């Protein structure tokens, strides 16, 4: 095993053995071994849009619009942060009132509700698709999770860092798949 990409707990792995020129798909104990000649092409997708794709002699990568999507969400995130800050100030005032024995506003919690962070994540999922030229297998398709906002302290910067880490892992996977399909590829 030269390289492994895990799809998540109990979701299997994709293993590349460059020394023996094999690709193993599935759960490690029951993985199917395929040779480079069995692989026609591959695509790595972000919400159905191609990020990376390759076939013998041809590797392409595409730019994501993640920065634009995050920019669109920023006002909603800032609004949540403001509401959260106001809530925390009011909750602190209530705690101080209770500690000082001046609990004459018992319905405070009925009036002030903790804000919910319900901004959608910019990316729902990534997927790896491998098109095969094999008598028994035609393709391999497996989804993998995308980063999520921290619901208590959402940040576009933190999300972009997590997204960058994930796409770098997927880029490494794409490079390794390309190396297996076409060792001459750059």
Predicted features along the sequence, with ranges:
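Glycine-centered tight beta-turn/hairpin loop motif at sheet-sheet or coil-to-beta transitions
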Residues: 9-11, 27-29, 133-137
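Core residues of folded domains in eukaryotic genome-function proteins
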Residues: 12, 19, 30, 124-126
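Mixed-charge, low-complexity intrinsically disordered segments
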Residues: 48-129
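Anionic N-terminal interaction surfaces
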Residues: 1-22, 66, 73
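Phosphoinositide-binding peripheral membrane targeting modules
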Residues: 19-66, 152
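Residues that cap or initiate secondary-structure elements
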Residues: 40, 48, 74, 134-138
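Terminal and domain-flanking low-complexity segments
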Residues: 92-186
């Amino acid at each position: 095993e030269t390289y492994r990409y895990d799809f998540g707990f109990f979701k299997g792995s994709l293993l590349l053995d460059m020394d023996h020129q094999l690709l193993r798909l599935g759960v490690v104990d029951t993985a199917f071994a395929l040779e480079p000649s069995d692989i026609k092409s591959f695509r790595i997708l972000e919400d159905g849009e191609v990020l990376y794709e390759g076939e013998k002699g041809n590797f392409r990568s595409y730019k994501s619009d993640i920065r634009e999507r995050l920019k669109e969400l920023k006002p909603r995130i800032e609004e949540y942060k403001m509401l959260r800050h106001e809530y925390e100030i009011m909750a602190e005032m209530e705690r101080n009132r209770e500690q000082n024995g001046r609990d004459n506003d018992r319905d405070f919690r009925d009036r002030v509700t903790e804000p919910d962070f319900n901004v959608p994540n910019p990316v729902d999922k990534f997927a790896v698709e491998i098109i095969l030229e094999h008598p028994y297998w035609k393709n391999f398709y497996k989804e993998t999770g995308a980063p999520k906002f921290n619901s208590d302290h959402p940040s576009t910067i933190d999300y972009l860092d997590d997204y960058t880490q994930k796409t770098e892992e997927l880029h490494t996977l794409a490079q390794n798949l390309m190396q297996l399909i076409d060792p001459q590829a750059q």
